[in-house]
Amino acid sequence: VFTARTGYTGEDGAELLLSADDGQKLWQILLDRGVCPCGLGARDTLRLEAAMHLYGMDMNADTTPFEAGLGWLVHLEMPAEFVGRQALEQAAASGPSKRLVGLKLQGRAIARHDYPVLHNGETVGVVTSGSWSPTLGEAIALAYVPTNLAKIGQELGVEIRGKAQAATVVRRPFYRHP
């Protein structure tokens, strides 16, 4: 068994890597000891509360680390050459035109992937991930908006079922495990 102190939920935990046969045995032992299985929906809600990015939803091959709030991982001051360095240097120099932000929505409506983000009635961005947060008791989302609107406290809207739902840009993560 290989144990990695990693995870994708923002909670304390570990990932276990083992053979399929050993995995089935361990699964049965855990069930016999009262562990309650959960599905991808629970994992994705925890991921969103922790504001952890999901590739293909919150970022893709066209997203720069600076847009996604991951610029702190890019160390252009180091002399190493790597594929994509020139593109990252250009992106860093010009600055992002959009940013990934956290949104809290008023009411119980849930923003979903690809829902339009509105400002003064105009579409200005797009939701990448959204869900009801059982921990916070409110709807939350990640969305890309123009950099000038990516300020904490900025009032925006999300179009949900043809209606504008009020939303506010908030600090991420939405929830941090104490």
Each language-model region and where it sits:
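Conserved, structured C-terminal
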Residues: V1-P178
